[in-house]
Design a protein with these regions (language model features):
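Conserved HGGG/HGGXW glycine-rich cap/lid loop of the alpha/beta-hydrolase fold
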Residues: 9-65
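Conserved alpha/beta-hydrolase "nucleophile elbow" surrounding the catalytic nucleophile
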Residues: 27-29, 93, 97-102, 234
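Active-site loop/oxyanion-hole signature of alpha/beta-hydrolase fold enzymes
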Residues: 51-100, 277
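Flexible "cap/lid" loop of the alpha/beta hydrolase fold
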Residues: 110, 117-158
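Acidic catalytic loop of the alpha/beta-hydrolase fold
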Residues: 236-240
């Protein structure tokens, strides 16, 4: 995997396609570029797609976290992503963010608003941040220490790949019959990838999202985010409250929301063909026709 020098660290990335339309893809917390392995090959070669890996994730450098995790703050990740674009000679591009990648995109929009064009968000952490839930650090500590716990935790990020009755406390998640061999292999690899994450990811991310929630500093600058936004949300999402997303879309000046009743947090691995179609239509200036309909999803699953 290629790496680019960004400040004092190296950031890893993968590229697909070529052309004047460039999309920077930013994964979510506990993630890596592999989260898009099923979707990226379905994208047209006329889109240049750059899938970046956060510091502390994947093949990127993993600096020792500061005591307050400030070097793993959302603003720091945003600066890394902008630095990667500089290193690759990309003056202007579109943005895509999944989950916590969404709030990283928002930081980039307020820092360099003229640099970015359209924004596609998938089940995003919003500019409001996220409250630190009771017991959350304990759960993350267990996931870090125990691969089985990590498997169970990540399964809730792609719930349609698993039998619903096994996604409960005390049960080991079991793949559903509809989960393809490729999806099963990828999910297993994504769990393996969590074994190398920095503590700045495991623990710095939730602490910084809680700081964002308490300060509302980024949310107070949403008036700067005038870029066209399309926000996708799977209604089976265990991780991001729908009311957060609805509130964000209401306050942004140029945003629309599409709901998908039969998808969870990660359309990119749950229904990659549907995700690739929406991604392609949006960034090639076509209005998405998916509309979250059951019929459309049924065909594409």
């Amino acid at each position: 995997m290629p790496r680019a020098k960004v400040g004092d660290i190296d950031i890893s990335y993968v590229e697909h396609g070529a052309g004047e339309d460039v999309v920077l893809v930013i994964h979510g917390n506990l993630g890596c570029a592999d989260w898009f392995d099923l979707a990226v090959p379905l994208l047209p070669s006329t889109l240049r797609v750059i899938v970046a890996e956060w510091r502390g994730c994947g093949e990127s450098d993993k600096p020792e976290p500061a005591d307050d995790y400030s070097n793993y703050a959302m603003a720091t990740h945003a600066a890394d992503m902008a630095g990667l674009l500089d290193a690759l000679g990309v003056p202007r591009c579109h943005l895509f963010g999944h989950s916590t990648g969404g709030i990283i995109c928002s930081h980039m929009l307020v820092t360099q608003p003229e640099r970015f064009r359209k924004v596609l968000l998938l089940d995003p952490v919003t500019p409001y941040g996220l409250q630190l839930a009771p017991g959350q650090i304990g759960v993350l500590t267990q996931m870090k220490a125990d691969r089985h716990a990590a498997f169970a935790g990540l399964a809730t990020a792609a719930p349609t790949l698993f039998r619903a009755e096994t996604l409960v406390a005390g049960e080991r998640p079991q793949f559903a019959d509809n989960a393809s061999a490729a999806q099963r292999r990828l999910f297993t690899r994504l769990v393996d990838k969590t074994r190398t994450l920095s503590d700045g990811i495991w623990f710095g991310t939730p602490h910084d999202l809680a700081r964002e929630w308490d300060s509302q500093a980024l949310a107070s600058r949403m008036d700067v985010m005038t870029h066209e936004h399309l926000v996708l949300y799977g209604k089976l999402d265990y991780w991001i409250p729908l009311e957060h997303v609805e509130r964000m879309v209401k306050h942004l000046k140029n945003a629309r929301l599409e709901l998908f009743p039969y998808v969870g947090h990660s359309m990119n691995i749950e229904v990659p063909l549907l995700f690739a179609r929406i991604f392609t239509d949006f960034f090639r200036n076509k209005r998405s026709r998916a509309g979250g309909s059951r019929a459309a999803q049924g065909v594409l699953q």
